């Protein structure tokens, strides 16, 4: 469950601008603020089932966006490459502060 939550949080971060305001609100409350379906339903004065359906549809949309655009997959690949690069620099060029500084700046862009 934690793995799914983490994945949804990343997908939400990447694709939230493609969602409707209601979808953004429900996903934010459910995944980021850890609200229950019942709490969201109460806040928006809708049924728990309506919230559940909206979240499930939105999850499917986020997965579909990722399947087409691959932003999260590419992010993970860049993260792994940066880690390998940092390790290589630390082992081969431990005194090159400028090189390490450049890698750290690349990491900040992520």
UniProtKB/Swiss-Prot annotation:
Signal peptide residues on this chain, from the entry's feature table: none
Superkingdom of origin: Bacteria
Alphabetized PANTHER family for the sequence: UPF0122 PROTEIN CBO2450/CLC_2298, UPF0122 PROTEIN YLXM
Protein purpose: Might take part in the signal recognition particle (SRP) pathway. This is inferred from the conservation of its genetic proximity to ftsY/ffh. May be a regulatory protein.
Family per similarity comment: Belongs to the UPF0122 family.
Protein name: UPF0122 protein Aflv_1766
Organism: Anoxybacillus flavithermus (strain DSM 21510 / WK1)
